[in-house]
A protein has these predicted regions:
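Glycine-rich, small-residue loops and helix-cap segments
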Residues: 3-9, 13, 18-144
């Protein structure tokens, strides 16, 4: 929930005026915002923005965002404990190999593709994904 809240907040600046894609057909500021965001963000990004806006909305902020921040603190502390004994945490970048464009459209499956990358985002630790090989299905996979 924290990552969607942060994505919603961060992506709000992509208005087509100062940042991000700018729609060419808009005639006014309001239309520029609407068209730029409609054309510039794909369905998955829009879903995550909406989920993040929900998490940050009145009545849900404490239920989700505040509790999520507490979980983040626990995760940060546990990660620091791990780094006392180990120099690196090696994880696959995603739980599956890459998939063909538009092959995965289920929102839950798409969201779960981030399961291994979200750790570094939540704890504030640096991470990089590197190509690791090619699966027998011909699709690449990586580690981070």
């Amino acid at each position: 929930m924290l990552t969607t809240a942060e994505a919603s907040s961060n992506l709000s600046r992509f208005d087509g005026v100062h940042y991000g894609y700018r729609s060419q057909g808009a005639t006014g500021v309001d239309e520029t915002y609407k068209k730029s965001r409609s054309e510039g963000f794909g369905p998955e990004v829009k879903r995550r923005i909406m989920a993040g806006t929900f998490v940050l909305s009145h009545g849900y902020y404490d239920a989700y965002y505040t509790k999520g921040q507490k979980v983040r603190r626990v995760l940060q502390d546990r990660t620091e404990e791990i780094f006392k004994d180990y120099d690196v945490i090696l994880l696959p970048t995603t739980p599956t190999t890459a998939f063909e464009m538009d092959a995965m459209s289920d929102p839950i499956s798409m969201y779960l593709q981030d399961i291994y990358t979200v750790h570094a985002n939540l704890t504030g630790h640096p991470a990089v994904s590197v190509p690791f090989g090619t699966h027998s299905n011909g699709m690449p996979f990586g580690c981070r």
